[in-house]
Amino acid sequence: MAGSVNLFVLNWNGRDLTLDCLSSLEKITYPNVKVYVIDNGSSDNSVTEIQNQFPDFEIIQLPENYGFSRGNNAGFQLVKQKADFTIFLNNDTVVDPYFVEPLINEMESNSTVKQATPKIFYADDLEYIWFGGGKINLWAGWIRHLGIRQKDSTQFSFNRNVDYATGCCVCMRTEDFESIGMFDESFFMYGEDVDLSLRFREQGGQILFVPESKIWHKVSSSIGAQFSIRKWKRKNIGKIKLIAKHIKPYQIPFSLVLTIFFSLLELIFSFTISLNKRK
């Protein structure tokens, strides 16, 4: 019998994106999935629309915007009927109907795999990769998506161990997620997914990229199109938290210098591109 899955979609004032995501989830082929929408105190009529259009999906309503980590943790904890596996999925995605099976198959066949994550494409450029695995070097101050903005090719067609699973879509055994302590709620947004993977790896776990599982992410594939000062600030706060938490104390000063240097380069580069696009 197929292992049971609880799938969580976090929503905050993202009605249209969430409705599209749920529409794709209605078509999934895995036989034993329960879909939950965690609403972070939305004010855009999301809850009513979801209830009307997707009555089979359960809504967990939180009183305010708890952010990514706390919101997902709270929704997960409020579900009394735990499943064998837990999947967290961004609301700004659409999924392949078959995306669940490869993730569960890999988790069931190898107990050392603690997280499985799919190949993720840009929704506005269907053959181009947004996430083909993750690579981390906190000592040098960088965290990278492998394959980002590259056209899909055979090099991204094989299972492989990676440094982290993106929170955009990650599958775990429920007991593993609970025993590791869930998401660290000191991360409001950005960095919590990398932190979770690092904690699993520090305990000897593997993070597996599973390209047979496919989803599409609704972010722009254009360089600089996604840039905002607020996002840049939050990402770098998350990165500094990761450095402070996961590397040796004597490495922290040099790592912070490199992080600040590369972050300022990113800021200048992205701001320049953004200005040129407005001309």
Report each predicted region and the residues it spans:
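Acidic helix N-cap motif at the loop->helix transition within catalytic regions
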Residues: L19, D44-N52, Q61
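Short, acidic, metal-binding catalytic loop of nucleotide-sugar glycosyltransferases
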Residues: S23-N32
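Glycine-rich, basic loop-to-helix element that forms the pyrophosphate-binding segment
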Residues: Q61-Q81, N91-T93
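Short aromatic/hydrophobic "clamp" motif used to bind/position activated sugar donors
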Residues: T86
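Conserved donor NDP-sugar-binding/catalytic core segment of glycosyltransferases
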Residues: T93-F131, I136-L138
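A recurrent flexible, glycine/aromatic-enriched loop bordering the glycosyltransferase active site
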Residues: I143, Q150-E175, V194, G224
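A short, conserved alpha-helix in the catalytic core of glycosyltransferases
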Residues: D163-K214
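Non-catalytic, C-terminal membrane-associated alpha-helical segments of glycosyltransferases
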Residues: S228-K279
